[in-house]
Design a protein with these regions (language model features):
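Short S/T/G/P-rich N-terminal loop/turn motif that feeds into the first structured element of a domain
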Residues: 1-75, 92-103
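A common structural junction motif
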Residues: 78-85
């Protein structure tokens, strides 16, 4: 069965807001990571947009071993209090991995 990838992108008005939420998200994710791995998450990446003037974006890319792992992990993620008091525009997109290139 194909793996599933979920991407979370968050856009902020200021660098300060991005940095404040970034710290919160990473601390919360660190507390969840063992359970997510147990539920079938196989990789996680996190990044900050660079080389774009006046754009403040975070992205998280999570990969799950299959659709069942995706479902179980997303239930945990969605039930978590991510402390969303800082304004942002958020997008979640999910994909079936149909091709991969490992260098």
């Amino acid at each position: 069965m194909a793996s599933i990838m979920a991407t979370y992108a968050q856009d902020f008005a200021t660098k300060w807001e991005l940095e404040a939420q970034n710290k919160r998200d990473l601390d919360i994710f660190d507390n969840l990571s063992d359970r997510l791995i147990e539920f079938g998450m196989i990789s996680a990446r996190h990044g900050v947009l660079f080389n774009q003037k006046d754009k403040h974006r975070l992205i998280a890319i999570l990969e799950f071993k299959d659709a069942e792992a995706y479902k179980n992990c997303m239930e945990l993620i969605e039930a978590t209090d991510w402390n969303r008091e800082i304004n942002r525009v958020e997008r979640l997109e999910s994909y079936v991995i149909d091709a991969e290139l490992d260098a």
